Structures are given as structure tokens and as C-alpha cells.
């Protein structure tokens, strides 16, 4: 596989990828009606992950992916780069929030418009390509477009993102259509937990351990042809330093294979993030450079650079005798047995590796609306708390739109991802939402809905601790609680 190079830095205009405007269709004179903001940009020049994935999904569902001719055959579900650029020139996403009030039902329509110049649009599409959400038909590993007429398809990761976006917004039939286009027998894309304020990845040594098991598998397989969904591992024998007549077997991997696996099979969104995560595998001594003269703690995917599994890495994978292959059970059993169900769940949600396994379990069993509600309220809590402390009027209006979105998605009578709440709490939230366009000042209304959403989050956490957690522990042989 050819060596890959970091893409050139995005042009200064890239930060203008966004006139991100929200307008409400009610009470044209109300200050809730309109707000605009620049998308937050990471230090690597990429919009924060939530905006980035929403923008990608909106672009995809607004573009006609159809049957296109390529050389002497046809490619299904494809489009050209030119089509995507045309879509991005005038892209908007409309969401309708229905709020019951004393005067009947009100409709709050939120329209998000993205104003993106063509130069920035091309740069953005290249970022989608690097994130492995898109791929070029004749060169899936490419990280730059050859020309504007090149033919593109969604990757398995791209289909997963769009399907989840549609499901979140209540378009279940469309979500199923997108979900049906990728191989469900393949492993799920590994989710990545992030700090909402910085978009930085939540990670520790256990997160690295989980990724190592996902990359290489708990079953000892050597050679590239065994399992194409794992990083290829090659067996290399060399003379033992202690006895020249005996040989030592090492397990070799190439940096480019590790890099491609991380970008294609996890929700990492740029190659600098991938380098940081992969470097942690070196820092925590799961892998080591083949050549000790290399910089020991800096991961590289340059051509020819390879790594060996360390003894710690081999033991973590369970490739040695007398080691339990179920590392998840071992991690769950590290939780203190005297803990309550809720304390155990809170511990799982704090540990990146256990959180990933638990969220995947919920999704697999079609009950992930509780997890998504929990995560949305966490994000709302962080954003509104900061807006309230700094008295940022634009951020407060954004918090209003966010609160309405949470209500419409999880708590309204026709919510596509309804969560189960106590009837009295549900009634309190519904009654307060009815005053959404009436209470002044806006900050006063938000403070109360903030409290109610935190109460709802606690109720959902209790629900997961009493039901989903027990099933998760039972399935994985965890604590018998």
C-alpha cells in the first residue's frame, strides 16, 4: 500500500465554512427567532464532530446518489465530486418542533443554512474523504481528489453516520434504507466519546486496550488473508539473543495498516487524531517500534514503518496460555462488588472502553434512545451552563434551539426516539415547553427546562441501571447483582 501524507493545511477561508443560521417560524419579532454563529473549529481546522457529521449527513441526503457509468461498467449508489460541491453551495436543514401550549399546538420550525464558498466546499469534501466517510471508486485509499468528475461512494462508516442521523431525526424508513446498504455482519464502527467543550477524545489506557483487541482480535490469526476486517499480523522469526540455536517469534504490523484500520473502523475524524490515539499504544507499551532508533513514543505510518506486539500486548489479546480471552469480563469485575447498580453504571460511563461496549450493546438491542438522550442532555448541560455563566446571548439562543430539539426527538408525544419517564415529570416538561415562546426573559425559561432535563436524565440513568445494565452484565458474565 502506498505511503500516505498529511493533507495540506486548509485555507484561511475554511473557517467560513459556516454561516450557521437558525430561524424559528413563530413570533417574528421574538429574539428566539434568529441566531447565527460560526462553527467551532478544532486546532486541526475541522469543525467540531457534531456539526461536522450533521453537515456531512445533510449533504448526503440532499445529493442524488445513483447509478453512474465508470469505464466499462456501472457503479450503484455513487455520485461525482461536482455534485457534492453543487449541493454544498446552497445547503439547508429544516427541523420541525411541535410544542403543545394552552392555545393548542404550536410549530417551531428551525432552519439551519450553511453558506459555503466553492473553495471551502472542496476543502470540506476532502476532509470527509480523509475521515473515511467517502471513498473514490477507483482508489479507495486516496486522500486527495484527482478531479471534480471523480466518482464517489459512501464507505461503511459513512452509511453508518447517515443512518444514525436519519434515525435521530425520525426518518426511520430512510434510515433503514441507508443501513441496508452496508454489511451488517461486519463489526460495528467503534464510537468515540468526546468532551463537548473541546471536542477532544475521552481516552485512557483501557481505551487503548479495547482498540487493540478490536484491531487484532482475541483469536491468534497470522497473515493478511485470514480476516480482512482486522489489521494484518505477520509472524517473524529471529535468533534468540540468549541462545543462537533457538528462535524467537515476533508479531509484526505495518503502521499504514494500523492507521487505515483506525480511520475506517472508528469514529476518528482526522489523521492527527489517529496519530495521537496510535501513539498511546506506544506510550502504554502495547506495541513497539521494530527499529529501536526510531522516536519511541511517536506513531508513524510512513512507508515501510512497522511495529511489533510487546509481551503486554500479546497478554492483553489473550494470545498466551492461561490468560482469559474475555477482557471485558475482567474489566467489569474490577468494579467494586459492593457498589449499587447506579454506581456501577456511572463507573461504566466514566471508562471509555466499558462505555463503548455498553453503548454498542444498547444499539444492538434497539434500546439506545436512553443512551442518546443521556448524551444529549450532558452536552446541553455543558453548553447552557457556560452560556449562563458568561451571559452569552447568542449561546443562550442556541441553547433554546437545542432544548427544543431534545424535546422533539425524545420527549414529545410523537418523538421518534421516545424515552420512558415518570408521568409527573413528563407532564412538568410538557407544560413548561408550552411556555417556550411566552416566558421572558428567555434565560429564565431555560434555567427551569435545564433543571427538568437533568431530572429526566437522572430518571433515564435509573432506568438503565435497573434494566439494560443487568442484561449487559448477564450477557458478559459480569457481577451477579
Swiss-Prot record:
Alphabetized UniProt keyword annotations: Cytoplasm, Nucleus, Pheromone response, Stress response
Keyword Nucleus: yes
Induction comment from the UniProt entry of this chain: By nitrogen starvation and pheromone.
Gene Ontology MF terms: GTPase activator activity
UniProt superkingdom: Eukaryota
GO biological process per UniProt: negative regulation of pheromone-dependent signal transduction involved in conjugation with cellular fusion; pheromone response MAPK cascade
Annotated region (Disordered), positions in chain: 1-31
Record-annotated DEP domain positions: 232-312
An annotated GO cellular component: cytoplasm
Chain residue ranges for the region called Fungal-DR: 33-227
SUPFAM superfamilies: Regulator of G-protein signaling, RGS
Location of the RGS domain: 344-474
Physiological role: Negatively regulates pheromone signaling during mating. Acts in a negative feedback loop that is essential for the mating process. This loop acts to down-regulate cellular sensitivity to pheromone. Activated by ste11.
Entry protein name: Regulator of G-protein signaling 1
